[in-house]
Regions:
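Surface-exposed, charge/polar-rich loops and edge strands
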Residues: 1-173
Protein backbone atom coordinates (compact mmCIF):
# COMPACT_ATOMS: atom_id res chain seq x y z
CA UNK A 1 0.00 0.00 0.00
CA UNK A 2 1.26 3.46 -0.82
CA UNK A 3 1.01 6.16 1.79
CA UNK A 4 3.99 6.22 4.14
CA UNK A 5 6.17 9.31 4.23
CA UNK A 6 8.96 7.66 6.21
CA UNK A 7 10.38 4.17 6.40
CA UNK A 8 9.57 1.87 9.34
CA UNK A 9 13.28 1.81 10.14
CA UNK A 10 13.60 -1.15 12.52
CA UNK A 11 12.69 -3.48 9.67
CA UNK A 12 15.69 -2.30 7.66
CA UNK A 13 17.91 -4.51 9.83
CA UNK A 14 16.25 -7.63 8.41
CA UNK A 15 17.76 -8.56 5.05
CA UNK A 16 16.14 -11.27 2.94
CA UNK A 17 19.09 -13.49 3.81
CA UNK A 18 18.65 -12.97 7.56
CA UNK A 19 14.91 -13.56 7.32
CA UNK A 20 15.51 -16.79 5.40
CA UNK A 21 17.95 -17.99 8.07
CA UNK A 22 15.39 -17.16 10.76
CA UNK A 23 12.66 -18.96 8.80
CA UNK A 24 14.85 -22.08 8.58
CA UNK A 25 15.13 -21.98 12.38
CA UNK A 26 11.32 -22.03 12.65
CA UNK A 27 10.58 -18.34 13.11
CA UNK A 28 7.32 -17.20 11.53
CA UNK A 29 6.84 -13.70 10.16
CA UNK A 30 3.66 -11.68 10.11
CA UNK A 31 3.30 -8.41 8.25
CA UNK A 32 1.10 -5.40 8.81
CA UNK A 33 0.84 -2.16 6.88
CA UNK A 34 1.43 1.10 8.71
CA UNK A 35 1.57 4.36 6.80
CA UNK A 36 4.29 5.94 8.92
CA UNK A 37 4.20 9.71 9.16
CA UNK A 38 6.62 12.35 10.39
CA UNK A 39 4.77 12.99 13.67
CA UNK A 40 6.85 10.47 15.58
CA UNK A 41 9.97 12.53 14.89
CA UNK A 42 8.53 15.66 16.46
CA UNK A 43 9.86 16.56 19.91
CA UNK A 44 7.51 16.28 22.85
CA UNK A 45 7.07 19.86 24.00
CA UNK A 46 4.63 19.42 26.90
CA UNK A 47 5.40 18.45 30.48
CA UNK A 48 2.09 16.61 30.93
CA UNK A 49 2.41 13.70 28.50
CA UNK A 50 -1.35 13.16 28.44
CA UNK A 51 -1.59 16.49 26.59
CA UNK A 52 0.73 15.47 23.73
CA UNK A 53 -1.11 14.88 20.46
CA UNK A 54 0.15 12.20 18.10
CA UNK A 55 -0.42 12.49 14.38
CA UNK A 56 -2.81 9.86 13.06
CA UNK A 57 -1.35 7.11 10.90
CA UNK A 58 -3.28 4.72 8.71
CA UNK A 59 -2.81 1.02 9.38
CA UNK A 60 -4.01 -2.35 8.13
CA UNK A 61 -3.88 -5.60 10.09
CA UNK A 62 -5.15 -8.46 7.95
CA UNK A 63 -6.56 -11.86 8.98
CA UNK A 64 -3.39 -13.78 8.06
CA UNK A 65 -1.26 -11.56 10.30
CA UNK A 66 -3.72 -12.10 13.15
CA UNK A 67 -3.66 -15.87 12.66
CA UNK A 68 0.15 -16.08 12.74
CA UNK A 69 0.52 -13.81 15.78
CA UNK A 70 -2.33 -15.35 17.77
CA UNK A 71 -1.16 -18.91 17.12
CA UNK A 72 2.34 -17.96 18.30
CA UNK A 73 0.92 -16.34 21.42
CA UNK A 74 -1.29 -19.34 22.16
CA UNK A 75 1.72 -21.70 21.80
CA UNK A 76 3.69 -19.58 24.26
CA UNK A 77 6.18 -18.44 21.61
CA UNK A 78 7.73 -15.00 21.49
CA UNK A 79 5.83 -12.31 19.64
CA UNK A 80 8.37 -9.68 18.61
CA UNK A 81 7.27 -6.24 17.46
CA UNK A 82 9.84 -4.96 14.97
CA UNK A 83 9.80 -1.24 15.62
CA UNK A 84 7.79 1.35 17.48
CA UNK A 85 5.34 1.73 14.59
CA UNK A 86 4.52 -1.98 14.70
CA UNK A 87 4.16 -1.84 18.49
CA UNK A 88 1.72 1.09 18.21
CA UNK A 89 -0.22 -0.75 15.52
CA UNK A 90 -0.59 -4.02 17.39
CA UNK A 91 -1.46 -2.23 20.62
CA UNK A 92 -4.16 -0.41 18.66
CA UNK A 93 -5.51 -3.63 17.13
CA UNK A 94 -5.32 -5.93 20.17
CA UNK A 95 -8.60 -7.09 21.64
CA UNK A 96 -9.54 -7.29 25.31
CA UNK A 97 -8.70 -11.01 25.15
CA UNK A 98 -5.07 -10.17 24.32
CA UNK A 99 -5.33 -11.41 20.74
CA UNK A 100 -4.61 -9.41 17.61
CA UNK A 101 -7.76 -8.42 15.69
CA UNK A 102 -8.21 -7.43 12.06
CA UNK A 103 -8.05 -3.66 11.76
CA UNK A 104 -8.30 -1.14 8.98
CA UNK A 105 -8.25 2.48 10.04
CA UNK A 106 -6.24 5.14 11.77
CA UNK A 107 -4.37 5.32 15.05
CA UNK A 108 -3.06 8.24 17.05
CA UNK A 109 -2.13 6.08 20.03
CA UNK A 110 0.63 7.61 22.15
CA UNK A 111 2.37 5.07 24.36
CA UNK A 112 4.34 6.45 27.30
CA UNK A 113 5.26 5.18 30.79
CA UNK A 114 3.58 3.61 32.58
CA UNK A 115 1.90 1.39 30.00
CA UNK A 116 0.74 -2.23 30.22
CA UNK A 117 1.54 -3.95 26.92
CA UNK A 118 -0.93 -6.59 25.80
CA UNK A 119 0.66 -8.66 23.08
CA UNK A 120 4.37 -8.48 22.24
CA UNK A 121 6.91 -10.05 24.58
CA UNK A 122 9.92 -8.87 22.58
CA UNK A 123 10.76 -5.76 20.60
CA UNK A 124 13.42 -4.63 18.13
CA UNK A 125 13.98 -0.89 18.10
CA UNK A 126 16.45 1.56 16.70
CA UNK A 127 18.17 4.02 19.00
CA UNK A 128 15.89 7.06 18.87
CA UNK A 129 16.55 10.72 19.43
CA UNK A 130 15.90 12.32 22.86
CA UNK A 131 12.44 13.75 23.59
CA UNK A 132 10.83 11.69 20.83
CA UNK A 133 7.60 9.74 21.10
CA UNK A 134 9.48 6.70 19.82
CA UNK A 135 11.92 6.85 22.75
CA UNK A 136 8.96 7.18 25.13
CA UNK A 137 7.47 3.99 23.73
CA UNK A 138 10.77 2.12 24.02
CA UNK A 139 11.13 3.27 27.65
CA UNK A 140 7.57 2.15 28.31
CA UNK A 141 8.40 -1.31 27.02
CA UNK A 142 11.94 -1.85 28.29
CA UNK A 143 11.83 0.24 31.43
CA UNK A 144 13.40 3.67 31.69
CA UNK A 145 16.56 2.62 33.56
CA UNK A 146 17.35 -0.36 31.33
CA UNK A 147 16.83 1.67 28.15
CA UNK A 148 18.93 4.58 29.44
CA UNK A 149 21.70 2.12 30.40
CA UNK A 150 21.60 0.78 26.83
CA UNK A 151 21.71 4.32 25.45
CA UNK A 152 24.72 5.20 27.61
CA UNK A 153 26.56 2.13 26.32
CA UNK A 154 25.54 3.05 22.76
CA UNK A 155 27.02 6.54 23.21
CA UNK A 156 30.28 5.17 24.65
CA UNK A 157 30.59 2.57 21.87
CA UNK A 158 29.73 5.02 19.05
CA UNK A 159 26.52 3.30 18.01
CA UNK A 160 24.54 5.09 15.33
CA UNK A 161 21.23 6.70 16.25
CA UNK A 162 18.16 7.46 14.17
CA UNK A 163 16.59 5.98 11.07
CA UNK A 164 19.69 4.28 9.65
CA UNK A 165 21.31 3.61 13.00
CA UNK A 166 21.86 0.57 15.14
CA UNK A 167 19.12 -1.42 16.85
CA UNK A 168 18.52 -3.26 20.09
CA UNK A 169 16.44 -6.27 21.07
CA UNK A 170 14.39 -5.94 24.25
CA UNK A 171 13.01 -9.14 25.76
CA UNK A 172 10.11 -9.12 28.20
CA UNK A 173 11.19 -9.50 31.77
Amino acid sequence: NEGAVTVPAAGLHFSRELMKRMEIKGIDFSFITMHCGLGGFRDIDVEDLTKHKMDSEQMFVEAEACRIVNEAKDRGNKVCAVGTDVMRAIETAVGTDGHLKEFEGWTNKFIFPPYDFSLANAMVSNFHMPLSTMLMLVCSYGGYELVMDAYNIALKEDYRFGTYGDAMLILDK
